[in-house]
Amino acid sequence: MHPRFETAFAQLPAALQAALAPLIADTYFPAMLSAEQVADVRRQSGLDDDALAFALLPLAAACAQTEISHFNVGAVARGLSGNLYFGGNMEFRGAAMQQTIHAEQSAITHAWMRGETGLAAITVNYTPCGHCRQFMNELNSGLTLRINLPGRAPSQLGDYLPDAFGPRDLDIKTLIFDTENHGYALKGDALTQAAIAAANRSHAPYSQSPSGLAIETRDGEIFTGSYAENAAFNPSLPPLQAALNLMSLNGYAWADIKRVALAERDDATIVQRDATAATLKALGFTNLELVTLA
């Protein structure tokens, strides 16, 4: 078990501990449960979907990286597949505050990068901030996304975001979690191809500037991130954050980064390379490889 989970795990009910123990024993537990695993954990613990998501929040919050605020937020996203995806807020000391990943963004992007096609619900241990409410409005679930908070009846995103402005107001048809392929040809080695594939999946309808990023760890694992643009612009999530999020949730440290490749167009309206390099430098990594989409 990864050390970050030990304290939270010890506080779980005994039946839930017994059900989860073999699943999270690996140091590189991927911070998600498949639909089959969820069904088995529910059977052993006696918890329904919502109760299980609430019970898992301490484990999700344990994934947070909060060097600045020291305030851990956890989120658990339930995909249409029945899979559960953990998320935690992530802060990067030495980088701009805008590079922060919120817990809801973490869980949602985690599900997206795993190939999920939509969300049925998201459970959070604190009320979503306005930034996250706007971010969630870019999903294909729209204002109907179910939001579960401790001590409150389930609500929909529309209850938290009245008079919403979003992609539908701009006649955007393809949303986050919908199938997207920008059609750029794969080339180069495995890391380069992974970055291009991530760019092909990116959601960039406002700037028309798709981008993707791939991280290779020292043990040869590759984690990718796709750019997630937002109708309100500022809540957009860069591809580096999506990849760092996936890597961290899988139990890796920033020191495990071996190579990073960023794929974007030379003539892109929105340029990721400078902010990407600056954030990587804050994490102690300085060799960003650039890949031109063509």
UniProtKB/Swiss-Prot annotation:
Record-listed substrate binding positions: 89-91
Record keyword S-adenosyl-L-methionine present: no
The protein's required cofactors: Zn(2+)
Active site location: 104
Alphabetical GO biological process terms: cytidine deamination
GO molecular function: cytidine deaminase activity; identical protein binding; zinc ion binding
Disulfide bonds: none
A Pfam match: dCMP_cyt_deam_2
Binding site residues for Zn(2+): 102, 129, 132
The reaction(s) this protein catalyses: cytidine + H2O + H(+) = uridine + NH4(+); 2'-deoxycytidine + H2O + H(+) = 2'-deoxyuridine + NH4(+)
InterPro entries per record: APOBEC/CMP_deaminase_Zn-bd, CMP_dCMP_dom, Cyd/dCyd_deaminase_Zn-bd, Cyt/Deoxycyt_deaminase, Cyt_deam_dimer, Cytidine_deaminase-like, Cytidine_deaminase_bacteria
Keywords tagged on the record: Hydrolase, Metal-binding, Zinc
CDD domains given in the database record: cytidine_deaminase
E.C. numbers: 3.5.4.5
HAMAP family the record matches: Cyt_deam
Subunit structure: Homodimer.
Purpose: This enzyme scavenges exogenous and endogenous cytidine and 2'-deoxycytidine for UMP synthesis.
Family label: Belongs to the cytidine and deoxycytidylate deaminase family.
Protein name per Swiss-Prot or TrEMBL: Cytidine deaminase
Lineage: Bacteria, Pseudomonadati, Pseudomonadota, Gammaproteobacteria, Enterobacterales
